[in-house]
Amino acid sequence: KMDFTPAARECGLPLPRGWILVGVPGAGKTYFAKICAQKLGFPLVNIGIDVVKSGGVAKFKQLLSRIDACAPNLPYLDEFDKFFADEHGKELLGILLTWLNEKTSSTFVLATLNRLENLPPELTRAGRFDRVFYVDFPGSDERKQILQLHCARFDKRYAESEHGALSIEEWLTIIEATNKYTGAELAQMAIDQEQAENSQIG
């Protein structure tokens, strides 16, 4: 957030442009965007592919102008690679590149996609976005933390102790079985387990 301050401008630092997040569906890119907006104290402006495609080139220009006018904010461009996949793709790309290079508003763009190779290479060159991050599958410790967090919604034991209602051996079995699960899949796993237990009680 310090990079948006007048002090940063006085030091000659450029305004941050934004980041690209690459990862499989369900890896937590949307959650990351929400947390980033929260940390910056900026409202999140969700710009989906439907919004861009339905309005066309002229509406996209208007949208970027509104984003500038409503700054500070965090524009969130989901399924970013699909923005440039049709006959208007080159025009949209040119408009966005110009805006990124010339913008003077306190906006921080987060663009997400599943595969970086689907993105026009112009967008990953220096001076476009500040960073490209890969959001990978959660590791073993992270999987346990995610499961414990979601299980605690249904059973307070998971919030009150290190292992909740399970033994260490049971946790090890679950962690091994959930290798390459996304955060979304782990959340659904906790919900499915709770529903199964409730159906047995009923």
Regions found by a protein language model. Give the residues of each.
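Walker A/P-loop NTP-binding motif of AAA+ ATPase domains
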Residues: 1-172
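Conserved AAA+ ATPase small/helical "lid" subdomain
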Residues: 133, 157-202
